[in-house]
């Protein structure tokens, strides 16, 4: 329970947001998380908590908070959506988020500093004193105690994305109203993998509905944008545009993993017309000889490894596309009157269907 963390009761943040788990050099499993309140309130305020267990599937017990060698808790940058990897005995922790405040025209950035301070639980002085600002994903190494920072944190992608492959923008009104992002740059949901000596940094992009990735020969620098792995609205498949999304799109987090010699991407999509109810999904992916991962199309097969058998019955909620031709992007919004996956005390089902709704299984 998150309530084991003493900060949960003090701050009124009882939820573990976007956790990640790694095995320590002592053979135990460590769960890294950030505490959050309802609908993400306070989730940017840190610190990063850690729970520990002898087995990967629980039961985890509160262990401590990520800190510097002098014992002070780590609040540098934005402690959010942590990811961890045991890199041959070196424990690496990644975290962060990104908003385009630092790319605003002169004079505008200063106007939004109080908004940043409120969002991130910092003072304006703390924000302006951090070279390059507090935005972007960062990496640090931990001691074997899995709590104490040994080196870093250092930023691994440019905070100022202008003129880079990570260039991303947001309409000025969106700075207050919510997700009005454009581009494939980092937003949140960091994850890290090492494949064939290459580091894969997987993240939820500012477009919000897709997992993207960048690669490097190094764990903490020189990452190169490589592309989109999956979109929960199949945006980008066959040139499909945002307005042509095949599902209600919204936040997706996830990563890739090799299971029995085959690679898969794990992600989630929206149900019940809200960004705060999500269905876990998976698709097989291919890593090409050059290290690239072509974007995968959503299917109804998941981890089946082959087409579903043409007999028996399947849940309606495994449809890969559900659209009336005008599906919204959710961000933090909720919707009624659209086709959606839902449930009651008896079953899961599709609702909000109307003339012209497409329900696709493949």
Go through each PLM region and give its residues.
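Carbohydrate-active catalytic/glycan-binding domains of CAZyme proteins
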Residues: 1-362
């Amino acid at each position: 329970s998150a309530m084991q963390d003493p900060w949960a009761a003090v701050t009124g943040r009882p939820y573990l947001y976007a956790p990640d788990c790694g095995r320590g050099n002592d053979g135990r499993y460590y769960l890294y998380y950030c505490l959050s309140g309802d609908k993400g309130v306070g989730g940017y305020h840190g610190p990063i908590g850690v729970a520990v267990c002898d087995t990967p599937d629980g039961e985890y017990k509160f262990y401590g908070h990520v800190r510097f060698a002098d014992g002070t808790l780590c609040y540098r940058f934005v402690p959010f959506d942590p990811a961890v990897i045991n890199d041959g005995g070196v424990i690496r922790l990644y975290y962060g988020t990104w908003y385009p405040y630092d790319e605003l025209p002169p004079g505008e950035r200063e106007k939004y500093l109080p908004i940043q301070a409120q969002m991130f639980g910092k003072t304006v002085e703390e924000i302006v004193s951090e070279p390059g600002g507090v935005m972007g994903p960062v990496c640090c190494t931990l001691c074997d105690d899995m709590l104490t920072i040994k080196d870093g944190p250092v930023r691994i992608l440019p905070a100022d994305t202008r003129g880079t492959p990570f260039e991303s923008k947001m309409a000025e009104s969106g700075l207050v109203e919510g997700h009005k992002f454009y581009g494939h740059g980092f937003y949140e949901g960091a994850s890290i993998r090492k494949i064939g000596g290459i580091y894969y940094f997987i993240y939820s992009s500012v477009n919000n509905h897709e997992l993207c990735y960048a690669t490097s020969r190094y764990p903490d620098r020189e990452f190169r944008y490589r592309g989109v792995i999956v979109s929960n609205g199949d945006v980008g498949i066959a040139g499909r545009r945002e307005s042509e999304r095949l599902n209600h799109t919204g936040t997706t987090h996830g990563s890739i993993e090799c299971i029995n010699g085959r690679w898969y991407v794990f992600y989630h999509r929206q149900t019940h017309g809200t960004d705060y109810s999500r269905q876990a999904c998976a698709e097989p992916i291919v890593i090409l000889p050059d290290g690239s991962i072509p974007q995968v199309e959503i299917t109804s097969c998941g981890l089946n490894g082959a087409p579903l058998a043409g007999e028996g019955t399947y849940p309606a909620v495994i449809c890969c596309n559900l659209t009336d031709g005008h599906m919204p992007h959710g961000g933090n919004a909720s919707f009624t009157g659209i086709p959606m996956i839902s449930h009651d005390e008896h079953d899961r089902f599709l609702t909000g269907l109307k003339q012209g709704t497409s329900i696709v299984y493949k």
